[in-house]
Amino acid sequence: MAKEKFDRSKEHANIGTIGHVDHGKTTLTAAIATVLAKNGDTVAQSYDMIDNAPEEKERGITINTAHIEYQTDKRHYAHVDCPGHADYVKNMITGAAQMDGGILVVSAADGPMPQTREHILLSRNVGVPALVVFLNKVDMVDDEELLELVEMEVRDLLSEYDFPGDDVPVIAGSALKALEGDAEYEQKILDLMQAVDDYIPTPERDSDKPFMMPVEDVFSITGRGTVATGRVERGQIKVGEEVEIIGMHETSKTTVTGVEMFRKLLDYAEAGDNIGALLRGVAREDVQRGQVLAAPGSITPHTKFKAEVYVLSKDEGGRHTPFFTNYRPQFYFRTTDVTGVVNLPEGTEMVMPGDNVEMTVELIAPIAIEDGTRFSIREGGRTVGSGVVTEIFE
């Protein structure tokens, strides 16, 4: 059977279900796919198929994640659902499943629970732009006032973590009833997806962002100059444009005088391309792995930042023992390791393998970073943690 061609005419967005264990995230995921399948462009998915999520490796961390896709009239969605709480934490911190928006599932029978709070906090820290709420299991609640109370609690909780709690759409329904084909509850799923379509902003495509390419390798071509190679992470670069060389040393400027891909000369390159960029007037020793080429003024070098970090458990090949403030591992950003010193928050004595923690880091050399930059923490070449920058200090 020939593979279907991916339809690019529709907007694409990545979303995921978040919320407390057993509040119905996976049932909702199955219900969305099943209800949308009745309306056309989507393949129905069973609960079991989603629940038996395959293991994936991301930055050396094992994560169970189910990926499904479905379509509304407006968009094509890639939806990620995780079976376990630990999988969520890892998923959000490593960026294994980049989320342009989330559906927060809260059981109307229980109200917000500890993981509800934790997932909202994580969404805020890792930069999920918008959340929509699905109050699930409303068929189990007879009291209209109780529903209103739960909705208020959820809105307050969202506001507490800097989401616009008063404006976030809240849809009440029952994923199980929708999955069983109850027309009233199927409509609630369509209402939810309408809210997701309308409320979650269309993500900016990588190729529309300012240019950046992490440098992987550098060599000189006699008579032509210095070439930096790497994969364009975002944006586009055209021959003749200026770029900055950022990280490790003082930032410098140069002009890209040639772009090559697979030994062919190009006029321009864009996000996803593996290229060699010929740099005017740059000596081979002026560029090194770990730096980035970037559109002038788009990203700056820093040494001190706050980050949300997941520490690998012993079973995942991580440390066997806890670490404390002043721990000095390597921080691996894009293509290189830089030593850094860890400062734990007040009241956190130590961090155990398997924990997630917010920490402050000071690197010994500046690196091009911004909010949302991902990194790994390594010791002697093995990964012991994974993190995302949440705030920059200096």
Swiss-Prot record:
Residues covered by region (G1): 19-26
Protein name, entry field: Elongation factor Tu
Gene that encodes the chain: tuf
Catalytic activity: GTP + H2O = GDP + phosphate + H(+)
Organism of origin: Staphylococcus epidermidis (strain ATCC 35984 / DSM 28319 / BCRC 17069 / CCUG 31568 / BM 3577 / RP62A)
Subcellular location: Cytoplasm
Keywords, alphabetical: Cytoplasm, Elongation factor, GTP-binding, Hydrolase, Magnesium, Metal-binding, Nucleotide-binding, Protein biosynthesis
Stretch list, region G2: 60-64
Binding site for GTP: 19-26, 81-85, 136-139
Family label: Belongs to the TRAFAC class translation factor GTPase superfamily. Classic translation factor GTPase family. EF-Tu/EF-1A subfamily.
EC number(s) given by UniProt: 3.6.5.3
Region ranges (G4): 136-139
Cross-referenced Pfam families: GTP_EFTU (PF00009), GTP_EFTU_D2 (PF03144), GTP_EFTU_D3 (PF03143)
